[in-house]
């Protein structure tokens, strides 16, 4: 019902009268978003889609007199397309175009506050999921992005032509700093490029951060001297405050570590962008862990798809980002994983619905982020990992290194031999999909460490249906 009062039409109007504009053609400067939307029973999808556009831009639940003080046509979000989700009842893809002026330059925090803010609690919606974002080049150019990127990292490490190898030190909690450093040393001297703090290692009573940093750096320097290779360990600088985080980063730089680590979701995008800018200024690589992501991205009809988080992290800044494995213990659909892996490291990615890429994305030469495959992987997975992720990736074996029956160093050697054998076989034109197991068995004949690993894990599989599929 509308009433005439104070010179404007007060009251409540359908959102679609203002925010549903199917004739609108998006501009190159618009930020585009695709939502998977489940309306409440009886609510038209166009009205729901318009509500999403309104509540994530300029709208509110009623007409307000201050609408007349601005140009709504210039600033409002516009739902320009609604289409049913194939194979799903009462689910729709809703495409919204947002004017560039709605977003602060260089702020991932501001973009997400608008797109995934109050609108996700809207009563007319049973569920809502942000599937993809197209960042316009004009906005991309306001972000620093990764501190260094894949090419610069390879130059700093002097490692080319193969994936990098890593390992998360286990047990994740409870080791003293000296024993932790010893485990790092054994893994690095055995053939790994990196070792890693687990995401929940910060500065607990059993191992304070400064002690860990010093013993780990000793392990790095000792293993480098023995192997004549550049080594590193992802020292987790995540802390309760940004000031403490930067203090730990400064200390890591002072002792000479090449790479540090941050938990970007629990730490927050503002803290992450701050740290990424510090890393570029100080020549330190930045490894990003995605702890908490499954709370946000695992449900198929509500939340945020990981491809959006990966895009946002690339803009916020990170040289590495965990991406799942497809073949390990953690959730990961192959087509969708390959889609967001490309969005992490390629400069230009074409729209491809078969891989979950809803928009063509031009990164305008922003450095790429290296995907990190980790979670329940071992030597038998090596051929599939090399084929799926290619050279510009980091393959991280935690239990698949430390669980070797002969210890950490032989476990690391087994992984390095398996990797080198798979890369050589691929370069010789052999199919890892068909001949991968044979490649590993052949290499195991002259590597007792690999042979022992192959025997130990020959029966281990993680065969569960993927929850989030395309």
UniProtKB/Swiss-Prot annotation:
It catalyses: 2 (2R)-3-phosphoglycerate + 2 H(+) = D-ribulose 1,5-bisphosphate + CO2 + H2O; D-ribulose 1,5-bisphosphate + O2 = 2-phosphoglycolate + (2R)-3-phosphoglycerate + 2 H(+). The record marks 329 as: Transition state stabilizer. Keywords: Bacterial microcompartment, Calvin cycle, Carbon dioxide fixation, Carboxysome, Disulfide bond, Lyase, Magnesium, Metal-binding, Monooxygenase, Oxidoreductase, Photorespiration, Photosynthesis. PROSITE patterns: RUBISCO_LARGE. The disulfide bond which can form in the large chain dimeric partners within the hexadecamer appears to be associated with oxidative stress and protein turnover. Its EC number is 4.1.1.39. Substrate binds at residues 118, 168, 172, 290, 322, 374. The active site is at residues 170, 289. A motif (Interacts with RbcX2) lies at residues 459-465. One of its GO terms (cellular component) is carboxysome. Transmembrane segments: none annotated. Its cofactor is Mg(2+). Mg(2+) binds at residues 196, 198-199. It is found in: Carboxysome. The modification N6-carboxylysine is found at residue 196. GO terms for biological process: photorespiration; reductive pentose-phosphate cycle. Binds 1 Mg(2+) ion per subunit. One of its GO terms (molecular function) is ribulose-bisphosphate carboxylase activity. RuBisCO catalyzes two reactions: the carboxylation of D-ribulose 1,5-bisphosphate, the primary event in carbon dioxide fixation, as well as the oxidative fragmentation of the pentose substrate in the photorespiration process. Both reactions occur simultaneously and in competition at the same active site. Belongs to the RuBisCO large chain family. Type I subfamily. Heterohexadecamer of 8 large chains and 8 small chains; disulfide-linked. The disulfide link is formed within the large subunit homodimers. PANTHER family: RIBULOSE BISPHOSPHATE CARBOXYLASE, RIBULOSE BISPHOSPHATE CARBOXYLASE LARGE CHAIN. RuBisCO folding and assembly commences when the nascent large subunit folds with the help of the chaperonin GroEL-GroES. Requires homodimeric RuBisCO chaperone RbcX2 to assemble into RbcL8 octamers, making RbcL8-(RbcX2)8. The exposed C-terminus of RbcL binds in a cleft in RbcX2. RbcX2 is displaced by RbcS; as RbcX2 is removed RbcS mediates the ordering of an internal RbcL loop (Thr-63-Leu-69) in a catalytically active conformation. Interacts with accumulation factor Raf1; dimeric Raf1 acts after chaperonin GroEL-GroES, binding to RbcL(2) leading to an RbcL8-Raf1(8) complex. The basic functional RuBisCO is composed of a large chain homodimer in a 'head-to-tail' conformation. In form I RuBisCO this homodimer is arranged in a barrel-like tetramer with the small subunits forming a tetrameric 'cap' on each end of the 'barrel'. HAMAP family: RuBisCO_L_type1. This is Ribulose bisphosphate carboxylase large chain.
């Amino acid at each position: 019902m509308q009433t005439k009062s104070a010179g404007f039409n007060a009251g409540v109007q359908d959102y679609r009268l203002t925010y549903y504009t199917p004739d609108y053609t998006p501009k190159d400067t618009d930020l585009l978003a695709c939502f998977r939307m489940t309306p409440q029973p009886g609510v038209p999808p166009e009205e729901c889609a318009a509500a999403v556009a309104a509540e994530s831009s300029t709208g509110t639940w009623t007409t307000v007199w201050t609408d007349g003080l601005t140009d709504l046509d210039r600033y409002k979000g516009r739902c320009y397309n609604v289409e049913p989700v194939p194979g799903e009842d009462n689910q729709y893809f809703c495409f919204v175009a947002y004017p560039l002026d709605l977003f602060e330059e260089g702020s991932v925090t501001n973009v997400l506050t608008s797109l995934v803010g109050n609108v996700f609690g809207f009563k007319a919606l049973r569920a809502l999921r942000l599937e993809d974002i197209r960042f316009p080049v004009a906005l991309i150019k306001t972000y620093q992005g990764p501190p260094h990127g894949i090419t610069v990292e390879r130059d700093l490490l002097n490692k080319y032509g193969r994936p990098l190898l890593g390992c998360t030190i286990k047990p994740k909690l409870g080791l003293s700093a000296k024993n932790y450093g010893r485990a790092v040393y054994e893994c690095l001297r055995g053939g790994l490029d990196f070792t890693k703090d687990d995401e929940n290692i910060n500065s607990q009573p059993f191992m304070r951060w400064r002690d860990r940093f010093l013993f780990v750096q000793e392990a790095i320097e000792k293993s480098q001297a023995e192997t004549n290779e550049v080594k590193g360990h992802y020292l987790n600088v995540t802390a309760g405050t940004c000031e403490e985080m930067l203090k730990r980063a400064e200390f890591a730089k002072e002792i000479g570590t090449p790479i540090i680590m941050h938990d970007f979701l629990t730490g927050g995008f503002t803290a992450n962008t701050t740290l990424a800018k510090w890393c570029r200024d100080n020549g330190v690589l930045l490894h990003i862990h995605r702890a908490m992501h499954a709370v946000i991205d695992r449900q198929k009809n509500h939340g945020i798809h990981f491809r959006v988080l990966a895009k946002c992290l690339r803009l916020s800044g990170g040289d590495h980002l965990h991406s799942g494995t497809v073949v390990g213990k953690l959730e990961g659909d192959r087509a969708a994983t390959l889609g967001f892996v490309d969005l992490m490291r390629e400069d230009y990615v074409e729209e491809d619905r078969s891989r979950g890429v809803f928009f063509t994305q031009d990164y305008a030469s922003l450095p790429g982020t290296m995907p990190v495959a980790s979670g329940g992987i071992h030597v038998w997975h090596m051929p599939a990992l090399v084929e799926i992720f290619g050279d510009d990736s980091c393959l991280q074996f935690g239990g698949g290194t430390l669980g070797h029956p002969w210890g950490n160093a032989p476990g690391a050697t087994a992984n390095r031999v398996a990797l080198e054998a798979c890369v050589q076989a691929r370069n010789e034109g052999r199919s890892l999909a068909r001949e991968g197991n044979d490649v590993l068995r052949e290499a195991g004949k002259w590597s007792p460490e690999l042979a022992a690993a192959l025997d130990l894990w020959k029966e281990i599989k993680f065969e569960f249906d993927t929850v989030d599929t395309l």
